[in-house]
């Protein structure tokens, strides 16, 4: 999951609160 696509990364980042 750490090497997911940029879309996935942005999704998790926003989830996080970034």
UniProtKB/Swiss-Prot annotation:
Protein name per its UniProtKB record: Lysozyme
Reaction(s) the record says it catalyses: Hydrolysis of (1->4)-beta-linkages between N-acetylmuramic acid and N-acetyl-D-glucosamine residues in a peptidoglycan and between N-acetyl-D-glucosamine residues in chitodextrins
Organism of origin: Estigmene acrea (Salt marsh moth)
EC code(s) of this entry: 3.2.1.17
GO biological process: defense response to bacterium; killing of cells of another organism
Record's function text: Lysozymes have primarily a bacteriolytic function; those in tissues and body fluids are associated with the monocyte-macrophage system and enhance the activity of immunoagents.
GO MF annotations in UniProt: lysozyme activity
Record's keyword terms, sorted: Antimicrobial, Bacteriolytic enzyme, Glycosidase, Hydrolase
Record-stated family: Belongs to the glycosyl hydrolase 22 family.
Activity control, per UniProt: By lipopolysaccharide (LPS).
Enzyme class: hydrolase
